[in-house]
C-alpha cells in the first residue's frame, strides 16, 4: 500500500464495524479479523463508533453512547490486544476517548472544526482527520497545521515527515459528485501526501449519502476496485468497514465488506505494494 516515500515501517489497516451494535457483535467481527491483525506486514487497528452523530434521520440507530461504547471498546482491546480507533464529534469527548483509543478520528463533516481538532491534538492519540466531501485536498494542509501547531507551536508548515512524527494523518473518503453520490479523485492521495500520511477509506468512498429514503446507501462491490487503485497511487494505509452480516448491519451495511472479502483485498493490495 506504500511507495518508497513512506517512512512508516508497516502498512496501516483500520477495520471494524461502522457502529457498535453490541459487545457480542464486536467480538464476532474481532475474531474474524485476527488473521489480518496477526499479519506482520500490517499495523492493525480495530475501529468502531460509539455514536454516529450525523445520521440522516432522527430515527436511525446511533450507537450505545460515549460511556458504554468506550467500555466495550476497552473490552475488545483487553481480550484481543488490538489497538483501537474511534471517532469523536464534540470536544468534550476527546479526553475520555483517548484513554481507550490509540487513534482519534475527526469525521469528514467536521474536518475544519478548530476547537475539535485542537482538543483531540492535546491528547496523546494519533489524530486521523477525514477529508470533507466538500474539501479541496490541498486545503487539508490547514487542518493538519492546526493539529501540528497544537502539538508543537514551533512548526510553521506541514510536511509529511513532521506530520508522521507528530501522529497527524489524513483520510480520503471521496468527494461529492452531484446529489447523493461520491467520486474519488486519485490525485488527492498524492496531493495530501505532500503534507501528511494518507489513509484511504475504501468503504465510505462508495457511499451514496442520503440516497435511500432517510438513510445512506452505497455499493460495496466498488470498494476493492478503488482500494487497489489507491494502493497503486501510493498510500500509507487502508480504512475499511467490515461486518459479519452487512445486509443486517445497523449503519452503512451497503458499503461494508465481509471479513473474508477484506482479507482477499488486503492480500491484493500488499502484492501491488511489492511493485514499488
Swiss-Prot record:
<protein>
    <recommendedName>
        <fullName>2-dehydro-3-deoxyphosphooctonate aldolase</fullName>
        <ecNumber>2.5.1.55</ecNumber>
    </recommendedName>
</protein>
<keyword id="KW-0963">Cytoplasm</keyword>
<dbReference type="GO" id="GO:0019294">
    <property type="term" value="P:keto-3-deoxy-D-manno-octulosonic acid biosynthetic process"/>
</dbReference>
<dbReference type="InterPro" id="IPR006269">
    <property type="entry name" value="KDO8P_synthase"/>
</dbReference>
<dbReference type="Pfam" id="PF00793">
    <property type="entry name" value="DAHP_synth_1"/>
</dbReference>
<dbReference type="InterPro" id="IPR006218">
    <property type="entry name" value="DAHP1/KDSA"/>
</dbReference>
<dbReference type="GO" id="GO:0005737">
    <property type="term" value="C:cytoplasm"/>
</dbReference>
<comment type="pathway">
    <text>Bacterial outer membrane biogenesis; lipopolysaccharide biosynthesis.</text>
</comment>
<dbReference type="InterPro" id="IPR013785">
    <property type="entry name" value="Aldolase_TIM"/>
</dbReference>
<dbReference type="GO" id="GO:0008676">
    <property type="term" value="F:3-deoxy-8-phosphooctulonate synthase activity"/>
</dbReference>
<keyword id="KW-0808">Transferase</keyword>
<comment type="pathway">
    <text>Carbohydrate biosynthesis; 3-deoxy-D-manno-octulosonate biosynthesis; 3-deoxy-D-manno-octulosonate from D-ribulose 5-phosphate: step 2/3.</text>
</comment>
<comment type="similarity">
    <text>Belongs to the KdsA family.</text>
</comment>
<keyword id="KW-0448">Lipopolysaccharide biosynthesis</keyword>
Amino acid at each position: 500500500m506504500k511507495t518508497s516515500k513512506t517512512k512508516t515501517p508497516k502498512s496501516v489497516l483500520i477495520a471494524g464495524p461502522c457502529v457498535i451494535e453490541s459487545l457480542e457483535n464486536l467480538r464476532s467481527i474481532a475474531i474474524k479479523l485476527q488473521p489480518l491483525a496477526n499479519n506482520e506486514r500490517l499495523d492493525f487497528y480495530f475501529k468502531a463508533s460509539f455514536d454516529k452523530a450525523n445520521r440522516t434521520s432522527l430515527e436511525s440507530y446511533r450507537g450505545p453512547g460515549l460511556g458504554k461504547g468506550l467500555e466495550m471498546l476497552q473490552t475488545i482491546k483487553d481480550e484481543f490486544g488490538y489497538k483501537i480507533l474511534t471517532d469523536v464529534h464534540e470536544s468534550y469527548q476527546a479526553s475520555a476517548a483517548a484513554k481507550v483509543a490509540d487513534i482519534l478520528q475527526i469525521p469528514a463533516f467536521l474536518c475544519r472544526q478548530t476547537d475539535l481538532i485542537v482538543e483531540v491534538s492535546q491528547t496523546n492519540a494519533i489524530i486521523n482527520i477525514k477529508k470533507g466531501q466538500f474539501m479541496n485536498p490541498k486545503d487539508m494542509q490547514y487542518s493538519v497545521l492546526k493539529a501540528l501547531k497544537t502539538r508543537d507551536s514551533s512548526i510553521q508548515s506541514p510536511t509529511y515527515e513532521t506530520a508522521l512524527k507528530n501522529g497527524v494523518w489524513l483520510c480520503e473518503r471521496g468527494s461529492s459528485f452531484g446529489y447523493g453520490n461520491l467520486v474519488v479523485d486519485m490525485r488527492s492521495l498524492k496531493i495530501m501526501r505532500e503534507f501528511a500520511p494518507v489513509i484511504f477509506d475504501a468503504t465510505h468512498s462508495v457511499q451514496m449519502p442520503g440516497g435511500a429514503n432517510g438513510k445512506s446507501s452505497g455499493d460495496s462491490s466498488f470498494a476493492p476496485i478503488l482500494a487497489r487503485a489507491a494502493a497503486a497511487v501510493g498510500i500509507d494505509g487502508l480504512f475499511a468497514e467490515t461486518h459479519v452480516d452487512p445486509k443486517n448491519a445497523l449503519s452503512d451495511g451497503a458499503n461494508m465488506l465481509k471479513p473474508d472479502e477484506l482479507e482477499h483485498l488486503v492480500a491484493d493490495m500488499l502484492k501491488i505494494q511489492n511493485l514499488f
